């Protein structure tokens, strides 16, 4: 997912933060906020994987490098950093596929992901609340309002895509009804936040016929996503050790039965 997200940003309109001051993209608000939040989210997710795969104090060099490159440095172009990060992630995936790199326990990884996503939702809700409750609100929204909205939307998109990928990579989760239902709820909640597409971001009172409060709306969806992610993490933590392996063994025996 991380490699695909990086490729989409680089192969699309390009990285807005790298543009010269005269370039039209340098004057945008939503796109730079989206891209910056996406890179930050991927960096934190990669850092989480590095922590889960660490052996003592030894962290996988490729994961460590990717997390550092994705975090960005002010004043430095992101395109070469993103390219190098994608290469590092690809090297790790290649080594892991050949059994040459440490990989995290699947349930532990899924649980850590859910906790991370819940933390994102909580932090974004706080930032959104600060903007919503400003004493003086610009019409229809300030630059900071727009940046806060699209930062939250970008993280929601990353979380939703990661959850979808997690289920595809571990189909045995469908054999655990409570966990499967919790995944459904989390995917739906994050998807609602990620799919908001206002023509113009508005941070108004919401009582007018045309201008809604989009910051409040995405904050509501993030509240549901936070609760769903916490619930998913709790349920994954309650899954008995070896449960997925037992399911695989049962399916093998059933397939071999006459």
Predicted regions: what they are:
Residues 1-84:
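N-terminal Sec/ER secretory leader and immediately downstream segment
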Residues 1-18, 117-125, 242-258:
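Ser/Thr/Asn(+Pro)-rich, low-complexity disordered segments
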Residues 15-27, 98, 130-144, 168, ...:
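Short, charged/polar, low-complexity loop and linker segments
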Residues 29-39, 78, 110-112, 143-158, ...:
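Short, low-complexity cationic-aromatic patches
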Residues 43, 47-50, 118, 125, ...:
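Structural signal for well-ordered, non-membrane alpha-helices
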Residues 71-116, 212-236:
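Short, well-ordered, aromatic-rich surface patches in folded extracellular/luminal domains
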Residues 82-196:
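Extended amphipathic alpha-helical interaction segments
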Residues 159, 164-258:
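A cross-kingdom marker for long, charged
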């Amino acid at each position: 997912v991380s490699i695909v997200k990086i490729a989409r940003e680089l192969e699309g309109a390009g990285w807005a933060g790298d543009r010269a001051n005269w370039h039209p993209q340098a004057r945008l608000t939503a796109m730079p906020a989206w891209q910056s939040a996406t890179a930050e989210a991927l960096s934190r997710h990669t850092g989480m994987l590095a922590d889960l795969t660490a052996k003592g104090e030894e962290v996988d060099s490729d994961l460590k490098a990717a997390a550092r490159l994705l975090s960005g440095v002010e004043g430095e172009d992101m395109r070469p950093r993103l390219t190098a990060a994608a290469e590092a992630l690809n090297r790790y995936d290649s080594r892991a596929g050949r059994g040459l790199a440490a990989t995290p326990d699947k349930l532990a990884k899924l649980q850590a992901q859910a906790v991370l996503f819940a933390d994102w939702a909580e932090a974004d809700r706080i930032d959104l609340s600060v903007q919503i409750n400003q004493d003086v609100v610009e019409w229809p929204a300030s630059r900071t309002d727009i940046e806060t909205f699209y930062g939250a939307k970008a993280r929601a998109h990353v979380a939703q895509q990661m959850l979808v990928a997690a289920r595809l990579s571990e189909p045995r989760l469908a054999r655990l009804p409570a966990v499967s239902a919790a995944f459904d709820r989390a995917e739906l909640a994050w998807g609602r936040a990620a799919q908001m597409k206002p023509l113009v971001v508005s941070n108004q009172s919401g009582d007018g016929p045309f201008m809604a409060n989009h910051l409040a709306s995405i904050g509501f969806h993030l509240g549901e996503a936070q609760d769903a992610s916490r619930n998913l993490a709790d349920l994954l933590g309650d899954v008995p050790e070896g449960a997925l392996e037992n399911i695989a063994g049962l399916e093998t025996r059933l397939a071999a039965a006459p």
